[in-house]
Design a protein with these regions (language model features):
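Glycine-rich phosphate-binding loops of nucleotide-dependent enzymes
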Residues: 1-174
């Protein structure tokens, strides 16, 4: 709870140090309430009083999102949130991000897991070593020859032409 309350302190006029010193009990209670609401919002309500370090890695990532949400952002910036997560943890994270999008939250996602990205985005930019390769909707981008070359090693010229148009599933791009 206190972990997420740090995010709420960032948007308050009290500040982190005043909050840490407990100088304003009413304000502290309000910030803790906001932190609890954000924890419940991301589906971790049953772990409200659990220490963050005791949570599984996927739950810790979701808790980090709750902390960011406590600062009431207009845009949520996420840098590789699915890195190192197991399949189920990625699915749980994806559900949280889908929920936030449904609520109208704008999300900028930097991620290398293409299955994860394709499931969540309605518009994406693909880069390779700092160079933009493609931009558009997932269905178009995943058929882009430059994207296929960079992330899948190119199109196999031994395949019949009809097979080139079929979605490819390797490294997460379908």
């Amino acid at each position: 709870l206190e972990n997420v309350a740090l995010g709420a302190h960032l948007r308050s006029d009290v500040g982190v140090w005043a909050g840490a010193l407990h100088t304003d009990r009413a304000r502290e209670a309000q910030l803790l309430h906001e932190a609890a609401e954000q924890i419940k919002r991301v589906g971790l309500g049953e772990y409200l009083y659990e220490q963050a370090g005791n949570l599984a890695l996927g739950q810790q990532r979701i808790l980090e999102i709750a902390r960011a949400l406590a600062s009431d952002p207009v845009l949520l910036l996420l840098d590789e949130p699915a890195a190192g997560l197991r399949y189920k943890e990625k699915q749980d994270l994806a559900r949280v991000l889908e929920q936030l999008r449904a609520e109208g939250m704008s999300i900028l996602l930097v991620e290398h897991d293409m299955d994860f990205v394709m499931r969540l985005t309605n518009h994406l930019v693909v880069m390779d070593f700092g160079t933009k390769l493609a931009e558009g909707v997932p269905a178009e981008v995943q058929q882009n020859p430059a994207v296929l070359e960079a992330y899948l090693g190119g199109i196999d010229d031994d395949l019949p032409e009809a097979d080139h148009a079929k979605p490819v599933s390797a490294g997460g791009v379908q």
